[in-house]
């Protein structure tokens, strides 16, 4: 990933500004078959309706957006299938992720196309355990949710690509290389590729993880 700091806590407004009457975008991933944009829209601005040749996934980090007839708030997500006409309207000053990726039907998991999803409602906590559920699964790109009971965690490990973590609920302690960091709901962090990291829940903790492997 580029244009975003790695291994430190991120606040959306510190990564991309919201400016009066403007639409702003930053490329985080720009590959032939995958792009991830971080975008901001000022209140009462819009992106005109368009058709796209690949699936589009949107995740709201701040504000209120309207996609056709679906209103999305913080921590809500929507997936549009290819060749579907839709536009984006900002009801408030807003920041969101746009992911464009070509998907086969079996690579879209546990997600209804064209309908908003409140991510914290998609996965229940398991007492004394960790639960996860895939939303998108390709060899080089994955999007999934995880729910940790308080005190539960992953063993330190490395990933073959950068992983963007979005804290949805609760608080956790992270290891990134030799640094320990705390993260809480509303914050994000990028785990750098091939760097030891882990997650240990301080309270019950839910997160969305986006993993991109640049082959």
Model-derived regions: residue spans:
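A short, N-terminal "cap"/entry segment at the start of jelly-roll beta-barrel domains
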Residues: 1-33, 74, 93-95, 100-140
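Conserved short histidine dyad/triad with adjacent acidic residue
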Residues: 21-24, 33-52, 128-131, 142-159
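Short strand-coil-strand connectors
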Residues: 32, 68, 91, 175-179
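Ligand-binding loop in jelly-roll beta-barrel domains
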Residues: 71-73, 82-106, 193-215
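Glycine- and acidic-residue-biased ligand/ion/polar-headgroup-sensing regions
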Residues: 53-67, 161-177
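A cytosolic small-molecule/anion-sensing beta-strand core signal
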Residues: 61-62, 92, 168-169, 184-185, ...
């Amino acid at each position: 990933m580029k244009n975003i700091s790695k291994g430190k806590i991120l606040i959306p407004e510190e990564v991309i500004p919201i400016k009066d009457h403007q639409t702003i975008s930053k490329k985080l991933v720009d590959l032939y078959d995958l792009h991830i944009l971080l975008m901001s829209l000022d209140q009462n601005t819009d992106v005109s309706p368009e058709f796209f040749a690949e699936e589009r996934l949107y995740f709201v980090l701040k504000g209120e957006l309207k996609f056709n007839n679906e209103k999305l708030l913080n921590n809500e997500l929507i997936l549009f299938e290819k060749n579907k006409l839709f536009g984006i309207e900002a009801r408030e000053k807003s920041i969101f992720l746009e992911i464009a990726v070509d998907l086969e039907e079996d690579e879209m998991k546990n997600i209804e196309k064209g309908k908003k999803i409140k991510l914290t409602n998609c996965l229940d906590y398991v007492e004394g355990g960790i639960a996860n559920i895939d939303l998108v699964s390709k060899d080089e790109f994955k999007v999934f949710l995880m729910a940790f009971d308080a005190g539960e965690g992953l063993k330190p490990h490395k990933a073959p690509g950068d992983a963007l973590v979005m804290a949805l609920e609760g608080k956790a302690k992270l290891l990134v290389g030799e640094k320990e960091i705390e993260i809480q709901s509303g914050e994000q962090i990028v785990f750098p590729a091939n760097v030891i990291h882990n997650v240990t829940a301080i309270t019950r903790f839910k997160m969305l993880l986006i993993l991109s492997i640049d082959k």
